[in-house]
Regions:
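Hydrophobic membrane-insertion alpha-helices, especially the h-region
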Residues: 10-22
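Positively charged n-region of N-terminal signal peptides that target proteins for export
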Residues: 1-4, 80
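Sequence/structural signature of beta-propeller domains
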Residues: 20-338
Length: 338
């Protein structure tokens, strides 16, 4: 947190100087939104706790520790997806700073291999999902992280899901890849899901309150031209609370971030969203309904969630390592559907 605050202070000074020049033309440099960067830096340097009063049903659940992520090169499991080709296999990748590679691991954390995708190194991979179309299994990886909320565009790439037993080490070629932006300015996002029933990709903003849900039709992603897409806003999500009063003492400096969505998965009529604090189950057919809360243990930087391959009431969650020698866990949570 100290390093983040120091960086934010430097950004604050730089962006404040540029914006103080008062010219609209310098509000952006190479397409990056300095106004949003300044606002983010100010939030980090002087964070404010946001309290929301949201009525949420707590549903019965049981959490099981599955194992440790054994591959030490997977130190920031920022996205998670259940395989559609193999039982008990998960896919993941590192947060920003790594090459364009994905990792396969068992649901107990055993390393099963790495695959490089033939694209330039990503800016900030933050989310992934697995899905099938016409019996072909795919993986979507979303380069949508934007802490400063200033990127001129973000992107997704889709590859055919490799066979863990036979394709180990194979270079994966992108099937589709697309750049896009949001209609109302840059958004930070770590929660993405593919809704094959409706034929769309969903993106849930992280920092906005209320959180905002956007979509892009899959058919537009599958076009081969270089057209920049514009995501369409679906709705505001009011049912994910940031905090309850009295929790500042429990979480300390992490308090302002505890209720921000860091992962999302979809199954049938449910959207499953995790935050650093708890998970929330939303009715995909009526997003105005209150979310159901699934209590999760506080395990540090929980970054990803995915439904298990065969169950609508079970999911895996993973967390990042804070340090290279720290254990990164995988948990399974089973819950009663409302």
């Amino acid at each position: 947190m100290y390093k983040r605050a120091t960086l934010a202070a430097a950004i604050l000074i730089f962006c404040g100087f540029i914006l103080s020049l008062g010219a609209a033309s310098v509000a952006k440099i190479r397409g990056y939104d300095l106004s949003n960067a300044w606002a983010f830096a100010w939030q980090v340097v002087a964070p404010k706790v946001v309290f929301t009063q949201v009525t949420s049903n707590v549903i019965a659940s049981q959490v099981y520790w599955m194992g440790d992520i054994q591959d030490q090169e997977l130190n920031e499991s920022s996205g998670l997806a259940s395989s559609n080709l193999s039982d008990d296999v998960l896919w993941s990748f590192n947060d920003s700073g790594d090459s364009a590679r994905i990792f396969a691991l068992s649901t107990a954390g055993v390393a099963l291999g790495q695959w490089q995708i033939n694209i330039p190194d990503p800016t900030d991979w933050e989310a992934m999902d697995s899905f099938t179309i016409d019996d072909q299994a795919y993986l979507l990886i979303a380069d949508v992280g934007d802490n400063l909320q200033w990127r001129p565009f973000v992107s997704v790439v889709i590859v055919a899901e490799p066979e863990v037993d036979s394709d180990t080490g194979k270079i994966l070629e992108p099937i589709w890849q697309k750049k896009f932006r949001y209609p109302n300015g840059p958004r930070d996002c770590e929660a993405v899901a593919v809704d094959t029933n409706r034929g769309e990709i969903l993106f849930l903003s992280k920092r906005n309150l209320p959180n905002e849900l956007y979509k892009i039709p899959l058919e537009k992603i599958k076009t081969v031209d270089d057209t920049m897409l514009i995501a369409e806003k679906v709705t505001d999500i009011h049912s994910i609370p940031r905090l309850s009063r009295g929790e500042e003492d429990r979480f300390g400096n992490a308090t302002p971030y505890m209720g921000m969505p860091t992962g999302m998965s979809i199954r049938a009529n449910y959207l499953l969203v995790t935050t650093l604090q708890d998970a929330y189950l939303l009715n995909r057919n009526d997003l105005s309904q209150p979310a159901s809360t699934i209590r999760l243990p506080y395990i540090g930087q929980r970054e990803a969630i995915t439904f298990t391959r065969h169950a609508d009431n079970s999911a895996y969650v993973s967390r990042e390592r804070a340090n290279s020698d720290e254990v990164a866990d995988i948990f399974r949570v089973d819950f009663l559907l409302p």
